[in-house]
Design a protein with these regions (language model features):
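C-terminal capping/gating helix-and-loop segments adjacent to ligand/active sites or protein-protein/ligand interfaces
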Residues: 380-434
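Short helix-initiation/N-cap motifs at beta->coil->alpha
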Residues: 84-94, 113-114, 191-197, 267-281
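Glycine-centered hinge/linker elements that transmit conformational signals in sensory
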Residues: 199-202, 239-269
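Hinge/lid segment of periplasmic solute-binding proteins
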Residues: 112-167, 306-310, 376
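Conserved N-terminal structural module of periplasmic/extracytoplasmic solute-binding proteins
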Residues: 2-117, 135, 182, 332-336, ...
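Periplasmic solute-binding protein
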Residues: 118-122, 146-186, 217-238, 320-326, ...
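Extracytoplasmic/periplasmic substrate-recognition and gating elements
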Residues: 261, 300-362
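Short, solvent-exposed loop/beta-turn-alpha elements that line the ligand-binding surface or hinge
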Residues: 131-141, 185-192, 232-251, 299-304, ...
Length: 444
């Protein structure tokens, strides 16, 4: 569920594509064509075309934005097959298994930012160095985005697809019914500068909560949003795990468990079927919204709620998420895979993904340009997403990543906080469960 960054072509092309922004978001969910593996190796089809396989998770949007169709029209001898596994927590272990065996890999494999450090430190020799690919230029990428996928020997094994600057998505109509401000500037002001103010707004909302709709979807989502505003979260700059004592983690944990205790959360696990159904049925009024989340909301809330969702600034700047495209050395169609990965992450394709998916560009040079800064999305009440996310991206701290970032984060949300939200455990019991699970994971 993420997207693009630089290549060799003129930024003018980016502007031309982004100028069309406002046409809307996601038109449909990616094929759920997975066969239980992180990828399937490519080859040829019965018509003599070269089949390039792409292993992804969630809604990355290449298909939805028409990029696969566009590429195959430009290259009629190529056929693209996308294999989707959802969520990323299921996808990544399978990717590691296939890397270990050297078989079953797609020609292109997506890697989520929470896993990229482990891949660059332990698996880099199993991927192509994309910094040497024709058309790839380092300067087209945010420095920190490029460095996240660069190993110690200088080999860059992934091209960034997006970044995840933070906002808050909210149901304007539910805020009105609850007697809260509904104008996005006024809503942003409700909680400006402090996540605790966000909870206070939730308590005011709960006094007149309409139709049984909770204030927020998930304590786990709130935790991830708040913790993503830190620079040293699960690891310090020396590479030492600090999740037990991290001030950022402890503060986000208290925020999330306080929200649960105050019954502000719908108690859902994000990205699951119940969460998707809750969106479709209007069962919560806000969600922590990195840029890529807008595509999720539009997809699962559907046309029924077009114009009722809006986007406000987050209490504090943060970056949650982002992905990369990598090409395994074991890819059957390695040369064609490199060409496709380079093309998919080129600036003009990045702009098309922004247009269709609200997948926020990694090209910082585009942020202040009017075609990006003034971008609006009809589904979200013409929210100025270019302005909102540009500011959040500029203000977000550079995060220290460690090998097990994704695992640690998942255990806090899907073990600790789920026990609190869905099993009635205390905040302290949930914390101990998360810490124990993380300790065990890091000992393996």
């Amino acid at each position: 569920m993420r997207r693009s960054t630089g290549s060799h072509r003129s930024r003018a092309v980016v502007l031309a594509a982004v100028a069309a922004l406002g046409a809307g978001l996601l038109s449909g969910c990616a094929d759920d064509g997975d066969d239980g593996s992180a990828g399937s190796s490519g080859g040829g089809d019965s018509k003599g075309k070269t089949v390039v396989t792409v292993g992804t998770y969630g809604v990355m949007g290449f298909k939805q934005a028409g990029l696969y169709d566009e590429y195959t029209k430009l290259h009629p001898d190529i056929k693209i097959e996308e294999n989707v596994i959802d969520p990323a927590s299921n996808y990544y272990p399978q990717l590691l298994t296939h890397l270990g065996s050297g078989s079953g890999l797609a020609d292109i494999q997506a890697v989520e930012v929470g896993n990229i450090n482990e891949v660059t430190t332990t698996q880099a020799d199993k991927f192509v160095d994309l910094s040497k690919a024709d058309g790839v230029k380092k300067e087209n990428f945010l420095d920190w985005k490029w460095s996240q996928a660069t190993a110690k020997d200088g080999k860059t094994i992934g091209l960034g697809t997006d970044v995840g600057p933070m906002a808050i998505c909210y149901r304007k109509d539910l805020f009105q019914q609850a007697g809260l401000p509904s104008d996005r500037d006024a809503v942003s002001e409700l909680w400006a500068g402090d996540w605790q103010k966000y909870l206070e707004a939730g308590k005011d909302y709960a006094k007149k909560a309409p139709g049984g709709a909770a204030f927020l979807d998930s304590a786990g989502g709130l935790f991830n949003a708040a913790v993503s505003g830190g620079s040293e979260v699960y690891y310090d700059k020396s590479g030492k795990p600090i999740y037990k004592d991290s001030p950022a983690v402890k503060k986000a944990w208290k925020l999330a468990t306080d929200a649960s205790a105050a019954k502000l959360s719908a108690g859902l696990q994000e990205f699951t079927k119940p969460w998707q159904q809750a969106l479709a049925n209007g069962k919560f009024a806000t969600a922590s919204c990195p840029a890529w989340m807008l595509g999720q909301i539009k997809e699962y809330a559907g046309d029924k709620y077009k114009g009722k969702w809006d986007v406000a600034a987050a209490p504090k700047p943060a970056n949650w998420g982002g992905s990369f495209l990598s090409v395994p050395q074991a890819a059957k169609n390695k040369d064609e895979a490199v060409k496709l990965a380079t093309w998919l992450t080129a600036p003009e394709q990045q702009a098309k993904l922004f247009e269709k998916q609200a997948s926020f560009p990694s090209a910082q040079a585009a942020y202040d340009l009017p075609q990006v800064a003034d971008a609006k999305l009809p589904y979200f009440n013409d929210a100025p997403i270019g302005k909102i996310f540009s500011q959040a991206a500029k203000d977000s701290p550079t995060q220290v990543l460690g090998p097990k970032d994704a695992v640690i984060k998942q255990n806090f949300t899907d073990v600790g906080l789920l026990q609190v939200e869905q099993q009635g455990k205390s905040a302290n019991e949930g914390w101990k469960a998360a810490i124990k699970t993380n300790d065990n994971a890091l000992d393996q």
